[in-house]
Amino acid sequence: MTNSSNNYVILVDENDNPQGTMEKIEAHEKAKLHRAFSVFIYNSKNELMLQQRALSKYHTPGLWTNTCCSHQKIGESNIEAGKRRLQEEMGFTTDLQETISFIYKAPFENGLTEHEYDYILVGEYNDDPKPNPEEVNDWKWMKLEDIETDIKKNPSLYTEWFKIIFEKHKNEMVKSPI
């Protein structure tokens, strides 16, 4: 697989059947449904690790969101993709498990649209991450009830997909402490 494959997403139908590939920016410009994943890392206190997206990101720079998210590569499992991206963005890896999947659509002010068949992956980690500054501006641990309160008070500080996932699926996302 060439380096350019990093810039492609897997187009899917509403049942997650592959329909080909498309360059990532083009898929977001055309609001094409594509496969994605969102990683949620909890510590032993059941706090969620949030990241603030790097200010250089092409969409939603500087907004708070889940631990990491991205797109699977062709032939890559959801878990493999989640572990790869967790290492690339946050500088660590841990065991992950799939919880739920769903489709969402979120348009942005810059004309791009996230339209994703999103897999939610959860894991546990109790150390500080070593974030990649090209991907992550900041990070923090937060209790779910504090996230819920802050999203209501300051919705513009969070990514649209995180607000959608959190509101609709927060009860299914929680990983019981080990």
Predicted regions and their residues:
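Conserved Nudix-box catalytic region and its N-terminal flanking loop in Nudix hydrolases
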Residues: 25-37, 43, 47-84
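A residue-level structural signature of the nucleotidyltransferase/glycosyltransferase Rossmann-like core
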Residues: 9, 47-48, 139-140
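Intrinsically disordered, low-complexity, charged terminal extensions of DNA damage-control enzymes
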Residues: 8, 58, 175-177
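Nudix hydrolase/Nudix homology domain
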Residues: 23-25, 62, 103-105, 112-178
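Active-site segment of metal-dependent pyrophosphate-handling enzymes
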Residues: 31, 45, 77, 87-128
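Acidic, metal-coordinating catalytic segment for phosphate/diphosphate chemistry
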Residues: 2-38, 44
